[in-house]
Amino acid sequence: MTVTEPATQRGFPLLPSRLSRGSKATRTTDNTAAALLLTFTVVAILWANSPWAHTYSALLDTHVGFSFGSHHAEMTVKHVVNDALMTFFFFIVGLEVTREFTIGELTDRSRAAVPVVAAAAGLILPAVVFLAFNPSGENAHAWGVVISTDTAFLVGALAIIKPKFPARVRLFLLTLAVVDDVGALIAIAVLYSDNIQVAPLVVAVALLGALALVRYLPKARGPAYAVLGAALWIALYLAGIHPTLAGVAVALLIPVFTPERAPVERAVQQIRAFRQSPNSRYARAASRSLRDSISINERLQTAVSPVVSFVILPLFALVNAGVLLDGPSLTAALRSPLTWGIVAGLVVGKFVGIAGATWLIRRTGLGVLAPGLTLRRIAGGAALSGIGFTISLFIVDIAIDDPSRQDQARIGVLAASVLAFALGWAIFRITDWLSPPEPVGLKLLRPIDPERDHVRGRPDAPLTLVEYGDFECPFCSRVTGAIDEVRAHFGDDLLYVWRHFPLERAHPRAFDAARASEAAALQGRFWEMTHELFTHQDDLEWSDMYRYAVAAGCDIEQFDQDVRVHSSKVLHRVSDDAEDADAMDLNATPTLFVNGKRHRGPWDAASLIRALEAGRG
């Protein structure tokens, strides 16, 4: 049987996917983007309310365009940003949605069930609340303003509030944000497009067919996507459908896949050839091999996302957030059911919808929360989900024609965002005060569960020893010998637990080895596979691990299926342990917990025996 290496799916930490579990550098980038968005929002508000407000209006109404023969095209600066540049924002959203449903967090349907249902409730209930304030008339058409959460501000708000152990709630909210974006995009496509022109629409459909075939081109796929995408934008614009949806359509048709061993090995060979004989031909070949080993979806996210985060979204905030906040405008907003409908929809509707749906699906047993994620954490995150900005202001511009009512709606969006932040901050602070978490890392965060954890010994043993380690760590290998002595000393009085904490920066094969051990565990061969991995921890290529699986007594066909085809079974099991370690601020392996408390000191058998004996009393 020919075996290919299953690609590591843990996050791609340097990529901009919002579900990435990546590094602190990635989170810093997210926070910087949110800060920049906030800065441009404040600048727009100050500018629109300054003595130079006329220059702000003049800038937005400035026409830009070009001529080609007898044809002339022009748009205002505001429409260039909202209709043209924002296409790239929706393009990135589409790429992320495609990736998450294909190879990301949403491939595990049971894991995604709770945030997906919560997101659906967070889309529907805010609209219902808004329509209770605006049941008819022109205002009712603006119900879409309250359905979306601004992901950039959501991430920034979590960074500012700094709730205890935020990793789980952050992942939950980012998963929810993906579904939230899908709902908003559908609303824009179906309900905020009118006066459809048939001929351009037919052209748009034909272009979509051509885009679907681009993946089969032997080369020049990038330029083909760009040219056909631009043509699709024009066709949708002429058809009367909001042209930014061209970005989503193109993104959904771009293939995404996990890196496979064969193209990666070809890239390594090309790099080795270039290292031995540097020349332009080898340089081009190496560059092309590296590029082809990663899906175009991933490459485009890496290339386009920084431009969207640091240029397009700040420009969008600048041209859309400049609402007049003088006395008459605020008075009109305070008396407007449009404003109050938006505030209530975003603040109350989002909170009740997300928190209520989470409670209900958990209570009925239709879904489960990830380890370490509590309902009170969900409540704080649900409140922050009322921060609506980017898509909310976007829909304000296309759903409302009257400038004065647009200002009332924008005031509602801004007020709701401030209130949602304050409510989220209060919930996190109050729950932390009423039920203060344990000091980070001093006590075991997640209790031992013999049904879930990998354990050796009696489940009701009076003494427990939990190890967070990785299979490439030489110290973990040495501790394994010491723990064998400790187990022999205590016999049935000791329950030993292994949990995964692969330190990928120091040990690049540790995560893959952990996945292999979990695939073996599905066949009841975890400890046998653990022995093989520690015995050969200097040789942890995937081809080696298949040999170790055979030596451990695994059915190799089933092992291959579990690590390649059904990889989410093992991926999330490893990630759960690693995220618990991250939540406890662990930073080294092995990390040991003796009777639930962090062990500080030597790892030799005698020291561990003394620590366990001290815990008997």
UniProtKB/Swiss-Prot annotation:
Q: List the disulfide bonds.
A: none
Top-level lineage group: Bacteria
Q: Which GO terms describe its molecular function?
A: oxidoreductase activity; sodium:proton antiporter activity
PROSITE patterns in the cross-refs: THIOREDOXIN_2
GO annotation, cellular component aspect: plasma membrane
Q: How does it sit in the membrane?
A: Multi-pass membrane protein
Kindly list the biological process annotations in GO that this record carries: regulation of pH
**Location, primary (coarse class):** membrane
Q: What does this protein do?
A: Na(+)/H(+) antiporter that extrudes sodium in exchange for external protons.
Protein name (Swiss-Prot/TrEMBL): Na(+)/H(+) antiporter NhaA 1
Lineage runs: Bacteria, Bacillati, Actinomycetota, Actinomycetes, Mycobacteriales
